[in-house]
């Protein structure tokens, strides 16, 4: 299973801890010199900034760039987005996109997989694949 995490801020670091047994690759533009990305991934988790600007209450250009620059079967967007953005991105890129928002934002660490539920939005088949990703981890 090849997994990529794009963005290594609070959200990306937390996700890395949660998926550590899958040995995900990490890419962050701040650390270009450590770029070891593969040509293709099963899953790419997008954890980039979507800042508020006067022109756009949720600037998703970095999300679009992350999707364009990485090749994956399914892109899981952890970044904050406005409703309808994932559908728009899917229409523009033709990629399989699942939205799985964070519960804690840019605050202290919180293990999302310890919750009794996970929010997934997108095509049902793609969402099931993301859900199954967790069951493929060896349980300690």
Predicted regions and their residues:
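NAD(P)+-binding Rossmann beta1-loop-alpha1 motif at the extreme N-terminus of oxidoreductases
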Residues: 1-40
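Small/polar loops that bind or transfer phosphate-bearing groups
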Residues: 7, 77-78
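Surface-exposed, flexible loop/turn segments at secondary-structure boundaries
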Residues: 11, 32, 52, 83, ...
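Short, well-ordered alpha-helices that flank and scaffold nucleotide-derived cofactor binding pockets
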Residues: 17-21, 68, 87, 91
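Short, well-ordered alpha-helix to beta-strand connector turns
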Residues: 23, 40-42, 72-73, 93-94, ...
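Rossmann-like NAD(P)-binding element
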Residues: 35-74
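Rossmann-fold dinucleotide-binding core
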Residues: 48, 81-140
